[in-house]
UniProtKB/Swiss-Prot annotation:
Record GO terms (molecular function): amino acid binding; aspartate carbamoyltransferase activity
Binding site for carbamoyl phosphate: R55, T56, R105, H138, Q141, G266, P267
Organism, scientific name: Corynebacterium kroppenstedtii (strain DSM 44385 / JCM 11950 / CIP 105744 / CCUG 35717)
Amino acids binding L-aspartate: K83, R171, R225
Function: Catalyzes the condensation of carbamoyl phosphate and aspartate to form carbamoyl aspartate and inorganic phosphate, the committed step in the de novo pyrimidine nucleotide biosynthesis pathway.
Protein name: Aspartate carbamoyltransferase catalytic subunit
Top EC class for this record: transferase
Length: 318
């Protein structure tokens, strides 16, 4: 595997392999006072973000540094992008500098795929990792969600996962639907009709407009943020009505199975899609998702830059 651009790039076996690798990294670092492995020493990773990020960017940076890579952050607001430099020229510049991997977040769907074409036309350039491209894909988020589900539920096959909220603008919803169904889960989208994408009926999911009817037998409820920055208005009458119909309240939490969990990719809008107290409830796995993100991204970087043949990631510092 050269790049990670979409969940379509991965088979069920490859997904399971990455999740196993992430779990191995987690266990290798557990209890260490110094969280440092020599796995990527001498490698150079650039994060190139054209959109704001807290979790994804810091998680990738931490993942690279915990494997001893040199991680350099490029922000559109403080680079030559501000002067009008194209994505193509930015990518080629960083490739010429010596990048081993480029991690890109971009508002345009397909940007990561295009970047990979520019920097590695013959497969000999840096690996490209899609950290979110418009409403298209966010593969590492889906992987960390799957790892969290596996840890909390004991497995994914046969589980019912309900994804609630702004499906229309959510790359997380798309990536999770692809990954989870490959691993044998039932995925249900719950949203108002105005927040469902055109053609969603062809996706490997079931559509529901009634959140309450899906709670009792769900193994996990994944709440999504309403992405107001991608809306011009008119998608729902008011925040209050949205919270009433599609928010995770204490009353709705009480209807869930004892071992069912609540997830959220972040950032959370407390008081809108999730109640303040529910956000901090024991069944809510948000911080576990964040923690797993580091280990999943370690596994992805290791797999793309080094490969999984003949090298241990747990080699001790000499």
């Amino acid at each position: 595997m050269k790049h990670l651009l979409s969940m379509a790039d991965l088979s069920a076996d490859e997904i399971t392999g990455l999740l196993d690798e992430a779990q191995n990294f987690k266990e290798a670092l557990e209890g260490r006072e110094l969280k440092k492995l020599p796995t990527l020493r001498g490698r150079t990773i650039f994060t190139v973000f054209y959109e704001n990020s807290t979790r994804t960017r810091s998680s990738f940076e931490t993942a690279g540094k915990w494997m001893s890579a040199d991680v350099i952050n490029i922000s559109a607001s403080s680079s030559s992008v501000k002067k009008g430099e194209s994505l193509q020229d930015t990518g080629l510049t960083l490739t010429a500098i010596g990048a081993d991997a480029l991690i890109i977040r971009h508002p345009s769907s397909g940007a990561a795929q295009q970047l990979a074409h520019w920097v590695a036309p013959n497969g000999d350039g840096p690996s490209v990792i899609n950290a979110g491209d418009g409403a298209h894909q966010h593969p590492t988020q889906a992987l960390l969600d799957a790892l969290t589900l596996r840890q909390r539920l004991g497995g994914i096959n046969g589980r019912k996962i309900v994804i609630v909220g702004d499906i229309l603008h959510s790359r997380v919803a798309r990536s999770n639907a692809e990954l989870l169904t490959k691993l044998g889960a039932e995925v249900v989208y719950v949203a108002p009709p105005t927040l469902l994408p055109y053609g969603v009926e062809t996706w490997p999911v079931r559509i529901s407009y009634d959140m309450d009817s899906e709670l009792a037998d769900a193994d996990a409820i994944m709440m999504l943020r309403v992405q107001a920055e991608r809306m011009a208005g008119g998608f729902f009458p008011s925040h209050r009505e949205y919270a009433t119909l599609y928010g995770m309240s204490t009353a709705r939490e009480a209807k869930m199975k004892d071992k069912a969990i609540i997830m959220h990719p972040g950032p959370m809008l407390r008081g809108m899609e999730i109640n303040y107290s529910v956000a901090d409830a024991p069944r809510t796995a948000v911080l576990q998702q964040v923690n797993n993100g580091v280990h999943v991204r370690m596994a992805v970087l290791f797999s793309l830059i080094i490969g999984t043949h003949g090298q241990s990631h747990t080699t001790k510092e000499s």
